[in-house]
């Protein structure tokens, strides 16, 4: 049994996989990696199944001892990681010898860095997922963010071809043996997080006046300090909310842009409530969800409307790249 010992947890570090889809009718939001594209790539670099659990660090990383050694990969934002004092490259599989210590600092770019390990982080599944759901205190490691002194178990690498294949699991694309791999320059460029988020019309978009839609599409918004995994709160152009910003509650989706009475939009995120009573002017497209996961407080964003067919085409293009041999190269 191989272990990860938490010497310092960082600001907010949790165990996350790709989430628990399909439980919205039971009131359980998907949770999972805020930037699932990065987590999936980190796992591919290691030969893991794409949906394997890793550690999601937010804004400030932790310090981890590897008493038994491990094969690792870092994905997402650069947190200035060092292994025994030597810099570690992002987006590249590397090996830590038994007893070595991996340290992270503050972010140098986006919001989240993913520490992936060959074999994955092994925890008790909750509703078919290893993801930590902070608001309910379930899943992950004891239902909470990591603390100093926590000890995590690394799974067996040779079990990757027998990963769960239920509704919450990505395929075992990439599972198997692995050499030293690096994300390709093309993939790094095409999957770069965006600050202009593409959106399709929301369920109540026709409730909003043309003037309100113009404000939404032409304003620059700043990510508020109060943002979290439940919702990304924005500050900027005030959108006149129809019906006083209230409506009969209905089911909501990841990436929905709600407009409450105050007129400041809220983007529903991975630990969103499953129903909501605010009108929704738009929905961030699936191909841009990973960009949401890299937004930091005070980052500035804009919105760009696209048609449904465009949104589907962009997602299909992204998934084609994720599944292709051009995603990474052998070193």
Predicted regions located by residue number:
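Conserved "landmark" site that anchors the functional core of diverse proteins
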Residues: 1-331
């Amino acid at each position: 049994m191989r272990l990860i010992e938490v010497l310092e947890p960082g600001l907010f570090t949790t165990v996350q996989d790709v989430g628990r889809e399909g439980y919205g009718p039971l009131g359980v939001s998907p949770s999972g990696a805020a930037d699932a594209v990065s987590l999936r790539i980190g796992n591919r670099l290691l030969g893991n199944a794409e949906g394997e659990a890793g550690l999601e660090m937010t804004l400030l990383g932790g310090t981890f001892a590897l008493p038994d050694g491990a094969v690792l990969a870092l994905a997402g934002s650069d947190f200035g990681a060092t292994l025994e004092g030597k810099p570690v490259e992002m987006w590249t599989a590397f090996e830590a010898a038994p007893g070595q210590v991996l340290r992270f600092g503050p972010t140098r770019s986006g919001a989240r860095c993913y520490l992936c390990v060959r074999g994955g982080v092994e925890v008790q599944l909750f509703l078919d997922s290893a993801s930590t759901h902070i608001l309910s205190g379930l899943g992950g490691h004891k239902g909470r963010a990591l603390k100093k002194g926590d000890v995590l178990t690394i799974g067996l690498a040779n079990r990757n071809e027998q990963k769960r294949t239920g509704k919450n699991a990505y395929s075992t694309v990439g599972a198997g043996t692995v050499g030293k791999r690096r994300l390709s320059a093309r993939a790094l460029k095409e999957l770069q997080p965006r600050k202009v988020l593409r959106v399709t019309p929301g369920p109540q978009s026709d409730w909003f006046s043309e003037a309100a839609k113009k404000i939404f599409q032409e304003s620059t918004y700043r990510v508020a300090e109060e943002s979290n995994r439940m919702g990304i709160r924005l500050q900027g152009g005030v959108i006149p909310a129809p019906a006083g910003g209230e409506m009969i509650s209905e089911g909501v989706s990841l990436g929905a842009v709600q407009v409450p009475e105050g007129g400041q939009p809220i983007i529903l995120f991975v630990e969103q409530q499953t129903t909501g009573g605010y009108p929704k002017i738009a929905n961030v497209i699936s191909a841009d969800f990973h960009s949401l996961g890299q937004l930091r407080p005070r980052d500035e964003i804009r919105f760009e409307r696209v048609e449904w067919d465009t949104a589907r085409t962009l997602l299909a293009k992204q998934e084609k790249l994720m599944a292709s041999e051009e995603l990474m190269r052998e070193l």
